[in-house]
């Protein structure tokens, strides 16, 4: 896994957000110029390094005969994406339309999810943590994943 853990961060009025040192290292290992592609999904901003974004984009655009709903979904994900670069201080600038879509305020949470990281409004992330996940073990088992705990 590439991106793990979570961190509370503050975003400034210009939308600049400092990534954690571990996330910055991962970005630079996949993209020497420090590029990240951001898009919106499920109410949060999702960040991909160029190789992982290319894989996702290829998968989405190679779907044969997608339904209208799926075409619209793909359209929103790809057309709503923006490539940004880390600045000298290790910050990314989140475009205003993505900040608005993600309902991001000053206080945010970075959450590592393997091949990507997510940027959540702090209140939304805390609400996510309050959800009851007891019933997901059955769904995981159906997918062939048995949790050892």
From Swiss-Prot:
This is Transcriptional regulator MraZ. One of its GO terms (biological process) is negative regulation of DNA-templated transcription initiation. The lineage of its organism: Bacteria, Pseudomonadati, Thermodesulfobacteriota, Desulfovibrionia, Desulfovibrionales. It is found in: Cytoplasm, Nucleoid. Keywords: Cytoplasm, DNA-binding, Repeat, Transcription, Transcription regulation. Forms oligomers. SUPFAM superfamilies: AbrB/MazE/MraZ-like. One of its GO terms (molecular function) is transcription cis-regulatory region binding. Residues 6-52, 81-124 form the SpoVT-AbrB domain. Belongs to the MraZ family. One of its GO terms (cellular component) is nucleoid.
